[in-house]
From Swiss-Prot:
Belongs to the FAD-dependent oxidoreductase family. It is an enzyme of class 1 (oxidoreductase). Its main location: cytoplasm. Involved in the hydrocarbon hydroxylating system, which transfers electrons from NADH to rubredoxin reductase and then through rubredoxin to alkane 1 monooxygenase. One of its GO terms (biological process) is alkane catabolic process. Its EC number is 1.18.1.1. InterPro entries: FAD-bd_OxRdtase, FAD/NAD-bd_sf, FAD/NAD-binding_dom, Rbx-bd. It comes from Pseudomonas aeruginosa (strain ATCC 15692 / DSM 22644 / CIP 104116 / JCM 14847 / LMG 12228 / 1C / PRS 101 / PAO1). SUPFAM superfamilies: FAD/NAD(P)-binding domain (SSF51905). Keywords: Cytoplasm, FAD, Flavoprotein, NAD, Oxidoreductase. Induction: Constitutively expressed. The lineage of its organism: Bacteria, Pseudomonadati, Pseudomonadota, Gammaproteobacteria, Pseudomonadales. This is Rubredoxin-NAD(+) reductase. Pathway: Hydrocarbon metabolism; alkane degradation.
Length: 384
């Protein structure tokens, strides 16, 4: 009698491990194989942008070793292992020359940092921080240094600016935009967040891009496209993430911005699912924890034999910028409204109302974040 094919989950980040936990509550017997390109330690990715202010190294942010996770989940976990191919027609994957069969396959391999082309002889001093191993490398490089240039003024860029500044570093932020968190924040809220970070000593250079990075004595010189030269010791790249889709595309799965899945988290091929940062769920690619958790619960049910679809209710995002606390909930797609700004300084309530006067989105800064629970009750779901 042949051995049962396992559920295979590629990825051991928040998406992979949370799905495995939820599924094991429903099915304790079916074999489970998890495969990861990194070291397999369990950690919370959002905590990567809090490590310096809390003075935590990578080991301090890790919550469990892969061996402990394997025991907890009754799973086999392959670390530092790259899947090289997917064969949907025969329900198998390839790890080099090794064939691994699956009952169901879940792609939870996340997103990768967007790489920016930079001239100069110091490109090795440019660090993305997208996982625990990236964080460990950067923290080692940052030891004894003080001047950090940060590329990107989006959500993650602002969180790292707050964290590194609170951790004692001198921060310069460079981004080719007119405000922080463009596309996410109303300009008034963006101005409040920027003011809060400037209060920590963060310097913003909005508009230009980093043209070249050159070694200069014991440090570096960052040459911006507008001619400004900023002395620094190392550079953090936080210009954004791109869902990993290449392997899925090569296997014939439908991809768009992310791997295309329906509300059951099913891809265009039977028995293959995706969730987390790599997935585009019914047209939405949301790189946040709340949607991921909702998807993990729904997919666990489906994989346990109880077909389920995910629904997104209101999903406000709490941004970790203590210099100016921020909670934001953009209006759902297809909904338009008028923005109104109340408050002053860094304490703003910025509401978006539709033509009937209903609140469909908000940005709350400073003391106004205390109103989030009341406002959340008024919000429409992102994907009902």
């Amino acid at each position: 009698m042949s051995e049962r094919a396992p559920l295979v989950i590629i990825g051991t980040g928040l998406a992979g491990y949370n799905l495995a936990r939820e599924w094991r509550k429903l099915d304790g017997e079916t074999p489970l194989l998890m495969i990861t390109a990194d070291d397999g330690r369990s950690y919370s990715k959002p905590m990567l942008s809090t490590g310096f202010s809390k003075n935590k190294d990578a080991d301090g942010l890790a919550m469990a070793e892969p061996g402990a996770m394997a025991e907890q989940l009754n799973a086999r976990i392959l670390t530092h292992t790259r899947v090289t191919g997917i064969d949907p027609g025969h329900q198998r994957i390839w790890i080099g020359e090794e064939e691994v069969r699956y009952r169901d396959l879940v792609l939870a391999w996340g997103a990768e940092p967007i790489r920016v082309p930079v001239e100069g002889d110091a490109q090795d001093a440019l660090y993305p921080i997208n996982d625990l191993e990236d964080y460990a490398r950067f923290r080692q490089a940052a030891a004894g240094k003080r001047r950090v240039l940060l590329l990107g003024a989006g959500l993650i860029g602002c969180e790292f600016a707050n964290d590194l500044s609170s951790g004692g570093y001198q921060l310069d932020v460079v981004a080719p935009c007119e405000q922080v968190m463009p596309g996410l924040l109303h300009p008034a809220a963006a101005k409040a967040v920027q003011a809060g970070l400037e209060g920590l000593g963060v310097r913003f250079h909005l508009g230009p891009v980093l043209a070249s990075l050159k070694k200069a004595g014991e440090g570096l010189e960052a040459h911006l496209s507008d001619g400004e030269v900023i002395p620094c010791d190392l550079v953090v790249s936080a210009v954004g993430l791109r869902p990993r889709t290449e392997l899925a595309f090569a296997a014939g799965l439908a991809v768009n911005r992310g791997i295309v899945v329906d509300r059951s988290l099913r891809t265009s091929h039977a028995n293959i699912y995706a969730l987390g940062d790599c997935a585009e769920v019914d047209g939405l690619n949301l790189l946040y924890v709340m949607p991921l958790m909702a998807c993990a619960r729904a997919l666990a049910q489906t994989l346990a034999g109880n077909p389920s679809q995910v629904a997104y209710g209101p999903m406000p995002v709490t941004v970790k910028t203590p210099a100016c606390p921020l909670v934001v909930s953009p209006p759902p797609r297809g909904m338009d409204g008028q923005w109104l700004v109340e408050g002053s300084g860094t304490d703003l309530k910025v509401l978006c109302r539709d033509t009937a006067g209903r609140v469909i989105g908000y940005a709350l800064t400073g003391a106004a974040v205390n109103e989030k629970l009341a406002l959340n009750k008024e919000l429409p779901g992102l994907m009902a």
